[in-house]
Every structure is written in C-alpha cells, then in structure tokens.
Amino acid sequence: MGYMETYKAWCENEYFDEDTRAELKSIAGDEKEIEDRFYKDLEFGTGGLRGVIGNGTNRMNVYIVRKATQGLANFIIKEGTQDKGVAISHDNRRMSREFAQEAALCLAANGIKVYIFPSLRPTPELSFAVRELHCTAGIMVTASHNPPEYNGYKVYWDDGCQITAPKDTQIINEVKAVTDFNDVKTIDEEEARVRGLYNIIGYDMDDAFIAALKKQSLNGDIIKQVADDIKIVYSPFNGTGNVPVRRILRELGFKNVYVVAAQEKPDPNFTTLEYPNPEDPKAFTYALRLAKEVDADIILATDPDADRLGVYSKDTKSGEYKSFTGNMSGMLIAEYLLSQRKEKGLLHENGAFVKTIVSTNLADLIAKEYNLKLIEVLTGFKYIGEQIKFFEQNNTYEYEFGFEESYGCLVGTHARDKDAIVAVMALCEAAAYYKSKGITLWDQMINIFDKYGYFKEGQKAVTMKGAEGAVQIAKMMDDLRNNPPKKFGAWNVVEFRDYKKDECTVIATGEKKPTGLPESNVLYFELNDHAWCCARPSGTEPKIKFYMGVKGTGLEDADKKLEELTDAVSEIVGL
C-alpha cells in the first residue's frame, strides 16, 4: 500500500478518533506533507521509537505507541515473564504522560502488571526502578534532548539496561508483526486497577534512588568544610532533574544552589531554550547570566530526562566561565573518582573502565594510570550498561566507571543507563574537593591535560530530513565504505574499520581482521599522530555525524589540529 492509500485509510477508519481524522483531512491538498507522514512506519529500532509528534504512520502518536507496546507485550508473553511486570516513566514533553498511560493500559489489557510513576521522573530512576522492582522490562517515554516537537519511547530489560542483542531484534520483529491496529489491546484504568494490573510507584522509590546515589560519595567531610563558600548554578532545562538534583545536593550538605527560575518548572515547549541540549552553548545563556550575578563556582545543566550533563567552571587565571565537552567532564569525573578510590584503597584489582568508540583517547591513558582494563563498545550507553551485566555473569571485571562523549556517564551500578543526577553529585563533590585545594574544576582539567596530553575532540552533524534525506545519508555512507580515503588532510589513514562488515583493515599490510564488536553502520578511520575520524548516521534523528579527535602539544595546537581535521573531513564528504 502506497503512502496515499495509507493516508486515506487513516482518514476513513473509525478506529482512529474524530480529531485525528479531521486533522488528517485538513492536509488533503498537501501531498508532500502526506508523503512525509505516511511514506513509512515510524521505525521501532534498537533505541525504541523517536519522532515528531503528530498523526500518521511516521509520527509519534497514541496509535503508534499502542502498536509498539502490543509488540512488546507479545514478546513478554512468549518469554513467560508477564508476572514480573513492567515499570514505566516519562519526561515533561508534550504527550509524554498520555503515551506512558497508553502503554500502561495496553500492557494491562494483555495481562501484564504495570508499575507507573505518579508523575515525571528521570531516565536513570526508571532504570533503577526496573531493577528494584525486579521487573521484566521498563518503558521510558522521552525524546531526551531533541527539539520540543519530538517525543520517544525507550525499552529496558530486566537488568535496567536498554535492550541489546538478541532481544532488541526479537522485540523489533514482534512490533513489526503487529500490522493491524485491531490486534492492539487496551483497557480502561479502573478495570486495570481492579484486576491488580495497574500500580502507582510510591515515593519510597525516590528515597531508594537517592540513597543508592549517595553511596557513591567519597568526601562528604570536605563538602561540609567548603559548604558555606561554594556556589552552584543549576538548570534542569524544564525537565525531570529539578527535584532529584536539588534533593541530593541538599542532603549532601551543599548550601548555595541557585536554580535558573525560567527553566525550573516542567515546560513541554522549552520556551527559553531553542534546543534543550547541554551540548548547545546557547542553552546556557540564562544560567551564565545567573552565575555572573551570584559569582558561582560551577554551572550545571541536565537535559529534559536527566541522563546528560553540561558543565561550566571558572578559570582562575581569566575569571571567565569555561565550557566542558562531554569528553572533558567525563575525564574530570574519572580522574577524581579513580584517584580518590585509589587513595582510600577502594579501587578493584580487576577494575574496568568502559567507553564508546567515538569517545576521547585520553580515557585510555587514565585507565592505564589506574591499572584498569579499558573496554571499548559501540556508540550508545546501552552497550556500557550491558558490559556491567557481562562482568557480573562471567565474574571477570568490576565496573569502575563508564562514559560516552555525548555528555553521559554512570558512577556506580544502581542503574544501567547514563545518570546525570549521580554525575551532578560527583562533579559538585569534585568541585568541593578541588576548592579545598585552592583550584577550580577548570584548573583541574588543565592539570589533567598537563599530565596525560592535550586531547581535543569535535563533531560535525549534518541534518537531512525526510525521505530524500535518508537516501542522501545512505549514499554518503556507501561512498565512504566503498571508496575509503587514504588521507584526511595532513593525516594518513593507519587503520580502517567497517563495523557493518565486521572488518578491520591495516593499511600498511592490507591485513584484515574482525572488529570484535557487534554489526553496526559505523566507519572508523584511525589516523597517525593519535588522530581519528568516525562516521555514523544518528539512530534517533535525521542526520549523519562525523566524530573527530586529535592530540596537540598544547591547547592552542590541539584546537588548530582539530580545525584542520574538520576541514579535511568536510572536503572529503563534500560538505
């Protein structure tokens, strides 16, 4: 059935409510809009669902959420784990509560017990709740840091980690097998409650979550020493972080926490934010203004579902606030935690440090410094969470720290997804520790570069929307795969890894070997002089990303080299 036939079927089928059909009929003369909404089904991929909110098969709406949930329910029933139940949470976005509720009622209609939070909660707390309640699965309704027109739906399994192979493919196949909306079950909330299938998660879960985070604190006594002097500015970006972040900082003894008022309360429109992403410097405009007013030591911001953290800190020399990349904040937390654990005799002899392949090579040197096994995984924090399960099952390593360049890390094993709440705690404690030594977080970052080398990373993302964009992205990847460049500007390619083919080619010898990682549409070019470039289409947005890294003799040299490598990449791919 073509997109126009599918569109007409939605307009005429009384399964869809009157408002939906009326809105669809209003676009009858706009064929391009109809095509974009109906040319494909919104893909339920390895990361779940992510798309623009609206009516149509290629949009996030209650019908698509129900259909995906029916597929998940069918899988759970085949696994025979429906009695363990499913935990559900959501963020502050438009339709988030409605989507969470629809998922809950679909599961209940299939005889699967549901535990749903009474209101918005962060992604890491959902991961924690799945483990705490011994559920078979979890659902988080969120589009993370995407623009306000987006929403999404992520699936977690019983270890609190987002689904990975082979279950991801098995669940995807079950979702695809639901082709008729009439096969999708639902039930009203009252009946679900009477049957004991619809349960509200109590506030004791919040208490347990905060208690688990506080176990990761290493220097509570030092916090008390500087509590009167250290000043923290925080923005939850109108999302889920506001309550848990303020609570944990208060309970740890921080007294001067200033919250950005315009970004404090839940706001699905993100009125003061063009893009609610801690990677975007413009998102810190309000926080920087407040920081200058109160003379803050550090500025922190969590994205709407509170799994990513952005950081600014004062530079003692200039007095200016400096921004940290996700690689920098990850390395700052790592060096603080590992040095303090070593000093206190808490480092494991068989400890492991986990990072994604597109994250900084500085991590390799920090892991070596603390005698940790460095493990690299594909892009996506679920692969870091999965490693913790492997460690436990095989009794191989003890998880010490894991991070990815996209502003996410996990301290502890209470959750199996990135956790900005515990990252806030770790960074504020680090700020207190270094303040007691007379330096700022930025000063300490420079100390880390002085110790290990001046690594610098960046990325270039190109958005290509709609059906045409998907074709362009695929062609760009095919060209790089079939005709891999031998040089990137002044850098020579030393090794070429095609993770889709599971093939690593050593350029000097022509030797080919497996990559050792699961199949993924990712191309990695290892260059000479510690430089590298990686290309991958985004799994959640209509864009292709190019990641790059260099090592310089100092900050300025690293900046210059990164600019040169970025220009070389742009020239190669025609951007």
What are these regions (language model features)?
Residues E5-A103, E191-D228, I232, T240:
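An N-terminal, well-structured beta->alpha segment
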Residues C11, E33-F38, L42, N151-T285, ...:
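Gly/Ser/Thr-enriched, mixed-charge loops and adjacent short helices
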Residues F38-N58, A143-N146, I232, P236-I248, ...:
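Conserved phosphate/anionic-ligand binding catalytic regions in large, soluble enzymes, centered on
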